[in-house]
Structure formats: structure tokens, C-alpha cells
Amino acid sequence: MESTMESTATHVSHEAISGGICSDRYEIEVPLDHFGNDGAGEAVKVSFRVLAGKSSSQDKYLLFLQGGPGFGSPAPWTASSGWIKAALDKKYRVVLMDQRGTGLSTPISCRSLEAMGDAPAQVAYLKHFRADSIVQDAERIRESLGVRSWLTLGQSFGGFVSVTYLLTSPGSLEAVLLTGGVCIRAC
């Protein structure tokens, strides 16, 4: 059973980047426990950026799911080269999500874990930072942007998250691209 908490993204900042690229940063509050098993209604913040070029379409979105786990999304000023530039040139808006626990999203640190108490309490908290929860966060972001479906690009651990997305919410995906270090085995 998935959580019914309604999530609305809050616009935090707008930044012009070289080459006519714009970066808009948002935050969205999502349930700590999307599946209603525990968490007592706690929420975490997920931060994301939407990069758009001069000719980006209003309905073509690419969600980048970075490797790790534990790394924030790429810096938006890298948008003028590499794969981000290629996606923008193909008129996609690129969504860079700081997965829960990383970057500008609600962080996980030694200090925050110690404050939770013993190891079982820490494990109970950390189980909400797996791929299935990241997929649900992405779904909340997609819905808040009013996007029917999008393309995902999963790099390394992000590829694992993309495959999890494909298995749990295939109707939300236009296509899935995987790169680097993904081992897919039968469950």
C-alpha cells in the first residue's frame, strides 16, 4: 500500500546558466515511508532541478538517476557540455534529483543517525532510503511537474533504480536508458 500524502513542489530558485540554459530548483516533501508500514507520518525533503534550454519542449522530460548510492545530482553548470547538452539539444527538460539522503535533500549523517539511538532504530530509518523509495519520490516529482511520462537515464546505482522504476511504474516511463556497472539478475 502506497502513501496518499499529496506532494506539491515548491520553487526555490531560478538561475541562468551559459548558453541560454536555465536551472530551476525545487523542493518537495514526501513521506519517509511511502508504503505505510511505519514512519508515523514523518516526511523528508527531496530537492531537484529542472534544466531547460531555449528550445526545450514543455512535455519532454529526462530524469537522471545518478550512481552511488549516496551521491547528489551533477552540478547544473555542467549543462553546457556532455550528455546534458545532448539531451537539451534534443529538446528535453532534464531533471536532476538529489535522491533522499543526498545533496540538498534531507541528509543522512553520522550525527543524525547517532541521534536515532541504537542500531535497530538506525536500520529501521535507513530502510526508507532504498531504490523503491527513490522511485516513489521520482513519481511524486513527475506528478508535481504535471508530466505524463518521462525518459530515465540511470547511471550505475541509478540504473538499478531505473530497473526498479520499470518494474513498479512502467506506465510512467517513456523509455529507460542504462549506463555503467549495472548487473541485472533474475530475482
Q: What is the predicted role of each segment?
A:
Residues 5-187:
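Gly/Pro-rich cap/lid or specificity-loop segments adjacent to the active site
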